[in-house]
Amino acid sequence: MKHLVQRFIRYVTFDTQSNPKKKCCPSTSGQMKFAEHLKQELLDLGLSQVELDEHGYLMAKLPSNVAYPVPAIGFIAHMDTAPDASGKNVKPQIIEDYHGGDIALGIGDEVLSPVQYPELHALHGHNLITTDGTTLLGADNKAGIAEILSAIEMLIENPSIPHGDICIGFTPDEEIGRGADLFNVERFGAEWAYTIDGGPQGELEYENFNASSADVIFHGVSVHPGTAKDKMVNAMTLASQFHCRMPADETPETTEGYQGFYHLKSAEMGVARSELGYILRDFERDGIARRKAFMQSLADDMNTQLKHGSVEIRFTDSYYNMKEKVEPFPHVIELAKQAMEVCDVEPIIKPIRGGTDGARLSFMGLPCPNIFTGGYNFHGIHEFASIEQMEKSVQVIVKIAELTAKKYA
């Protein structure tokens, strides 16, 4: 625990922003530099089977300290930060004993305000780590990495705490949906695992969205504007017409809880060709299928009305709801709940309105729910973390390892 904050502050100085436009893995060189740093740290801690592969996947093991067989469990976090905001030259600031009110972020005009982020009201007395208002912080997911390694350090320094084999995995490119692409589950060696990639204290998640993307391509007819009457088909107009027919009350900014959505994420516009990039999210498989069918029906309807030009849609599934793969192993959830309760943390079981590496890993044979980090407002300049909640995450990780060993004693 003594090195938790120092670790985190050091980790966020690495620029590990992933790049969805790059097809290589990892998608950015900074992730590999960070992985090499972590590899040395794992070796310095004395862990075994420390391996960093050419794709930036880093794995290691803390061997069991008990004489009887205990299932190997794992803890996983990702090394990249989101492309949504800069992760370069992160300058974290520590706010000691927060007593309310606005927090100035750096020397500019940006503030972290409880008016905009009311969760701050519950954090009076906490020590907070914030940005300087120019970058994201990187608590997603470097807080998770720092917490895992601090928990491992605690287990090493306290051999009286029983534990089985503890497998550690740090992945690249999670933020661009590729974190599990080349993850070797067999090499990892755990029977089940936990991603340490959640938000506020108490979060325990084993449900997530089913996720698909839809690239909607509009083919127009380009003609000189001066002679375009009855000839031009403006693909940008088609794109506008299509989007105007999408449900306005089923977007990220209008939904919560178990509600799904359509999200227009990108647009490339031109007269001859335009493209809209959507992501589709729903907690039910039938729901995601209905969303695809609805969008396809819009395209089909437009195509029947067009004499020239056309609309096509390409759907790609990204990940599925891990619930169906985790629920058959209730002990995985119960151990995490029990660990939280012993550590005086109230479990908050709720769906992830997103995805984690664990969602895909669960479908690869590794049940893998998600546990809190103590971070807030991920992917933007108002991201921050509570040091006290980060410390609780460390305690919960240690307690999961201990309770697992005691369960099989």
Swiss-Prot record:
Entry's EC annotation: 3.4.11.4
Residues annotated to bind Zn(2+) 1: 78, 140, 197
Single Gene Ontology BP annotation: peptide catabolic process
Residue positions of the active site: 80, 174
InterPro entries, per the entry: ArgE/DapE_CS (IPR001261), Bact_exopeptidase_dim_dom (IPR036264), Peptidase_M20 (IPR002933), Peptidase_M20_dimer (IPR011650), Peptidase_M20B (IPR010161)
Keyword line: Aminopeptidase, Cytoplasm, Hydrolase, Metal-binding, Metalloprotease, Protease, Zinc
Highest taxon, organism lineage: Bacteria
Note on cofactor: Binds 2 Zn(2+) ions per subunit.
Any one cellular-component term (Gene Ontology): cytosol
EC class of the enzyme, as a word: hydrolase
Record keyword Hydrolase present: yes
Cofactor: Zn(2+)
UniProt: Zn(2+) 2 binding residues: 140, 175, 379
Chemical reaction(s) catalysed: Release of the N-terminal residue from a tripeptide
A Pfam family assignment: M20_dimer
Cellular localisation: Cytoplasm
GO molecular function list: metallopeptidase activity; tripeptide aminopeptidase activity; zinc ion binding
HAMAP family: Aminopeptidase_M20 (MF_00550)
Known role: Cleaves the N-terminal amino acid of tripeptides.
UniProt-listed PANTHER family: PEPTIDASE T (PTHR42994:SF1)
Family: Belongs to the peptidase M20B family.
Name the UniProt record assigns to this protein: Peptidase T
Organism annotation: Vibrio vulnificus (strain YJ016)
Encoding gene, per UniProt annotation: pepT
